[in-house]
């Protein structure tokens, strides 16, 4: 990796290697950076990885963290080193990134109809590649290529997946009758349910389906309800693969409200930006916009006494009733929804608790 003028957030007109940059042990606030800048907190990343790894070990589960959150080789390496079974992907493009990094086990948690991608996937020497199907047409496209298929169970009004257990059973029978494919198990996503009671009902249906079909693998589990997934699926006579991915970055909004480990996970993503104007009493404008920080679930979280009231392409509106900030001040912002944070940055400094840059994350979205 080379750090130069193309690396957003870095003041590095003359190129240096990542190794040279890290050897300098730059400070976040005195080093060659410009604002806005997203950073990751090393202690929080490491803590979150350890916490989930311990949880899955303690409950006899396998973990295939969803790589879509970070698409970062350095973070994938942390997760795999902590014991992850493999990685989850949503698209063939993500699988291509994983393959280039040498990842040997992938769960493609999405239906696939792209014939060019199917042909490429069929040629890859994975230790294990699991793919989804929820219709006869999907099975037909996968036929004859050696794919191991998870039948996806959905629910009415939900996302993908067979709408009833009977549909899923019929699809399993079709897989058994089709040459060149193998029934690997069942899978689903509980996060489209309206509440925890709905999640529990759905997971009971998924477990019952898996038992009826003697499924070798059962998979579920985003980052919001993995406690319920553990309660309902742990201890099955099957390999249970859970897929939380957002946990590694956690946040100060959506997952702080929703995660069953909200009191134990730590926000690892911080965005720093500079006040560029205080044009009227009670208002400040920050050089931070939609290209820099997530805004799909919540607006960014400002320091105490300040509130983000609006976000534009390059500017953030702050309510500052106490007149706490002035132009030039650098502020820390928290995020909501890490899955739409990492994609905004190609290189992300990792800082220790003294705000020294100790690593660089690259992303491939």
Please report, for each region that a protein language model flagged, where it lies by residue.
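Active-site loop/helix belt of alpha/beta enzymes
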Residues: 147-148, 154-259
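C-terminal accessory subdomain/extension
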Residues: 279-365
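Active-site-proximal beta-alpha core segment in soluble small-molecule metabolic enzymes
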Residues: 64-195
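Flexible, glycine/charged-enriched surface loops at secondary-structure junctions
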Residues: 61-62, 214-217, 327, 342-345
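Conserved, mostly hydrophobic/aromatic
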Residues: 45, 68, 98, 151, ...
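A charged N-terminal "starter" segment
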Residues: 1-123, 361-365
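Active-site loop ensemble at the mouth of alpha/beta enzyme cores that anchors a bound cofactor
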Residues: 226-304
